[in-house]
Amino acid sequence: MVASANGVVAWRRRDAHDDPVLAILGGDRRHPARIADKRLLRLLRCFGDVAVGAGTLREQPELVLSPQQPSDEPAPELFAFRERAGLPRQPRNIVYSFSGELPLQHRIFTTAGIEPLVVTTQRGADELARRARPGASPATVAEDLREPGGLHRAQQRLLAEHGVRYLDCEGGQTLLEALHGARLLDEVFLTRTPFVIDETAHEDVGRIFDFAAAGATLIAEGGTVADESWRFERWRFSQR
């Protein structure tokens, strides 16, 4: 996750050019700290499978949850790590959605070598099947996600039916809060940028956890030599 200096992680977009993540990151893709953040993201995708919420999927049409997206520089060492760990070349791309109202033309569902999987409700699974006709729907795990215990059952099925043991959840904040509320969130890797977002200029502003109030412990923190105003934090919620 990335957050501004004042803890903002998202807001309701006004249009396609109003990109919260880009604004929080400062816009300059060549900044050394921005490159470090990207490398960390790619590394974390090596340890298991990767998940996002439906909102993140809709807002990022070019997203593929891979250690090497089509626009990334080659990094064969990342795939070599997965091979040594006995993992498939690409992580499963898991999307959480209550409604199943997902754009099936998205890259996650159309990129060769990517195995998509949707965690949803029964209604959501039915909606996915309708949208996919006459083709096949993506694989789904359907549970009553709004019911206490629904997310727990979904996670148990991800392991039992699909072998999902370690899950790198890239947000957004709504999904992280749901996983935390279900006591499923172990750690958060947070990149805190030096940029301050004017909250009065946006609607439906989302904020990162108050980690101390949520019972998390800061177990690691670092920066970059090029710009120490960027902070890379690792917060632990659970000792599992």
Model regions: which residues?
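Enzymes that bind and transform nitrogen-containing heteroaromatic metabolites
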Residues: 1-240
